[in-house]
Amino acid sequence: MFTLSLLSRGHGKLGQDKQKLEVYFEPEDYLNWRSPEDYVPVSKPQDKNNASQHSWSLFLPKTFSTRKGALILYSEGFAISAWTPKERRKGPYCPRGPWRKLDLELHTLQDLKEAILAYGRQQGEQDRAWQPYLHFRSQLESQAQRQIQPGHSAKRYLRGLLRTWPPDAMYRLWCAGYIKDSVLLQDSQLNVPKKLRPQQDLSGVPPKYHLLPVFPSFWIQQGKSFEQRQQGLDEGEAGAAGHVDQGPLAKNHGSQGTRLPPRRKQPWQEDETQAEDTSIENHLCLYASKESYNEKTQQTSRKAFGHGRIDHSWLPSDKSHITFCGGAFPNRKADLSDKQRNVKLHKARSSHLLQVLPAERSLFPPVASATGSRIITPGEVKKKKAPKALKLPPISEEPPRVLEPLKSQFKANEPPTELFILPVEIHYHTKQPPKEKAHRRGAPHPESEPESSEESTPVWRPPLKHASLETPWELTVHLPVDASRDTLSPQGSSSLPPASLGNLTLKGSKARHTRVHSQGKGVWKGDDDAPPHDVAPPLDLLPPIKGKKSPESQKGVDSPRTSDHNSPPSLPNMRVPRRALPAAQEDSSDPTLGHFLLGPDGEKVCLSLPGHTQTEALPSGKAYESVNSNISHEEEGPSSQHFLKANTEPRANLHMNLYETSPLTQTTEKQGAQQSLEAAAQKTGEPQSCINKALICSNRKEFYTRKLHIDMTPFLKESGNALDYQEEAGRPLRETHHNDQDPEPRSMTLDSPRASRTEHIQTPEADIVQKVGRDYDVHHLHRGLLGYGPESPERLSAVYTSLLPREREGKAEPRLFSQETSANISHERDLINEAKRKEKPKKDKTKGPKSEREGKVYGQAEAAIGKSKDSKAKKKLEKKTRPQRKRTQKERNLEIAAELSGPDVSYEETEDTSNRGSFASDSFVEDPWLSPKYDAQESQVSLDGRSSPSQIATVTGNMESKEERRCEDPSKALLTKREQEKASWDRLRAERAEMRWLEVEKKRREQEEQRQLQQEQLERAKKMEEELELEQQRRTEEIRLRKQRLQEEQQRQEEEERKQQLRLKAAQERARQQQEEFRRKLRELQRKKQQEEAERAEAEKQRQEELEMQLEEEQKHLMEMAEEERLEYQRRKQEAEEKARLEAEERRQKEEEAARLALEEATKQAQEQARYWIFGQQLP
């Protein structure tokens, strides 16, 4: 009996390719293998009603080998077809006893291996020969009746796995480019109806195919029952398909096989009629309805499983613990031993076909019920009386997870916790209109709810569409083409600012505006301020983001609105008044707070301010500029118009009326002022762009400010003194204006050119003093014209109507002007002191290059008003800011006041004009927002605006002189007043001269200190040079000494090495000499020994010859002698021989002793020579 595998029965030999081990059998092996005892002996049943009494003996080999190296339980090479005995083929047989529950249960692959190796140890009949497993009686019957699968086919497994896909899966893969081989699409058979798909013979060699089933079945029937099985399958799917009839009819007819439940529809296939029923036949789970099988087959199978230690849990069932491939399904309960319990279980399972089985956590899909699952009617039972063989259960289908569209991981009604929106333009093609709030703020944040339906979700999404953003709207994402323009998209779409402007973070459904920091510093050149479309605008002042309007402001707002924001490069340094913000926002650390303001029409505005200018103090400390919410710069072409029609039409009409009144006066004065400014610029050496630079305001309230001031000059000329009475009332307003923080951030008040806000920031005290009242009247008129807030048209009309009567009253009030001059002078002194106090903190904010330019401007302004050459030369050397700015302030204040003195009005006006022109350029140099890097083209936009103050000064001065000439009979009091004024002016000039002298002395001291400092620096530099030279010499000496030491050390080492080499050579020479002496002695010893041996041989030869002669003589003598004499002679002979032997022995011992001593001496000499040699080798 063999207990080993196929390889152990024969002998293996390597094939010709040296890679395959082939087994060769001898005739004895074939005889033992195919002997009649090898067949399975089946004993007849003792009791027909008890199938457990059938017994058979089975001796399986403990290991099974194949050429592929796989271990399989059954080998097709040993199987013989038709295992049913012929005498038991008449009718079906149904066992009536309970199944025997075996104690062996296989749960893992390790259990299977142990069961295979332990199989056959306990066997009832040991006397029989070895019987291979499942040899069939008749080999010549139909080969289609083979019952054993030769192993596991990976191709079939893959084919069944791919058949679980939807019918259009292969087409989708092909369209996506994942399948490029057209052969795969030809034989895929996914779109072929299941009735037409061929069934495979699993017992034979698998044909060549591309797509494979999941599990091949153990038993397959072919032949005439194929159509019946297909018909039964269709009937089982079309019928009730939910109940099992395992009653007496089924028992009487021997319904022992298992039926498979019809395929249930999964939710992912309910809407696809072509994808239905895709796996039940693909898994090759066929119904056993073949009538050719009879009761013999059943009896044989029952006999085989009666005593064979094969648990029915090993066979495929709904509670099977193993698959055909050897894998196990976890969390499976132990199977039921009672058949009726199994039937009840299958009834319970098959009655709920619409329930989805829970997915087992295993490598393979879960196994569904495998026992009878369709209604067996009496008609069908009559047709199908043959027993059914066991088949593999189907695989309960799950929705395919490979090509399943990506679903959102959020819950159904839960918005995302945080959503990052890229700055792109997103158009929502909505089924319902989105919220207005999201579109008005420019930050779309729809509540994203993931869709559970897979119909609206594409399988393959474009890269720009985010799978996690599944919203009720269809998203169309467009990258922004023009980064400088953000147009408000129509309804159903919304726009985001460009990526350079920042980002918006949506938390839940509420938008949070983060601060936008500007990084661009670009400069645009040209007359028009519109930036090029391919360049992002420099974010000096970012446009506001419109918010939702308040309820009270939505009632009558019909003005056109646009979000096209083009930020001009020359914007002033705007500040948002902190008073306009709530207290909670003012102290908050949230960067988003402080951006939301209330507009003039109740609209919430989100301002994006550059840098940290919200909390930064202005240089003047007091002047803040309020910003309008609707900043709209529609600058197209060279027009440079900054206004909105809805709020500026009344003012535009006023400007046109004023402009039409006096065109000639405006033209002449405009030219004169421009020439005076150009002259001042040439004197100061400043670039023309610094003087001509105009502040282009980003406020809709300011329109044609340069021309507006020029057009108002006729009214100022004629009204002159008529407007002077407003001075005292206007000055408190002027002072409060400096300390004011506008509570409504709606209008941006700019003092019109010459009294502009930039000059307020740089020199507030000078702006208060200049012209003492006239310029303030102009400024006040402009404040009235420009207005604050929505009520500005009414105030504008009021001021306009009040101008004409005051023109007529101007001639009758010449005294009021002179009466106020003394109060003005005292007030100017207070302002001078205040300017001194304010000048100290300003000095720290100025920079070196700016102060140098300031010094040049100041010195050249002095030269323009008649300064001495010495003072002019000294002023050119000034580099400090504080004294120069003090003197400039005082000079301007005093010269402005000097205009009131009467006869000197033209000179003082010229001086004041030139001084102010130079100082205007100085203020522009100091202004951080207006640097000289802007070109002349841009600066000439506001040329007329900068030249208008000089026009006003000249016109008002001429007006005063005319009034004085008309009034030739002034009163005594007026003359006294003028004398007093002259005296005061003399005192002021003396004070100014004293201040100049002090400044000159201070400059001289500063120059002396600077000279001393330079001398000290030169001495320090010389000393440092000397120290460096000494240090360099010391380092050179150290390097030289280090090199010398290194050379000496190297020479010493070389000398030592040379001496060591000499010693080594001497030792080697001694060793050589000793060796030669030793060899010589050895040669002498050898020669002596040879001589001695030769002498010894010669002596021995002679002795032999002598012995022979003596023997001959003795023989002769003995023959002659008597007996007694002969005996005596022999005795003496023996004694002589003994004596000679002893002498020879003694002589030999002496020679050996001498040879030993000589050898010892030679050995000692050799050892000494070897010692010298080793010592010589050890030396370096």
UniProtKB/Swiss-Prot annotation:
Keywords, ordered alphabetically: Coiled coil
Pfam family, one: DUF4670
Recorded superkingdom: Eukaryota
InterPro entries: DUF4670 (IPR031440)
Region feature Disordered, mapped onto this chain: 229-280, 431-465, 484-575, 730-758, 810-986, 1045-1109, 1125-1152
Annotated Basic residues bias: 431-443, 509-518, 872-889
Biased composition (Acidic residues): 269-279
Basic and acidic residues: bias regions: 730-745, 826-837, 846-856, 960-986, 1045-1106, 1127-1152
Coiled coil start-end: 988-1171
Feature: compositional bias, Polar residues: 486-497, 937-959
UniProt-recorded name of the protein: Uncharacterized protein KIAA2012
Gene expressing this chain: KIAA2012
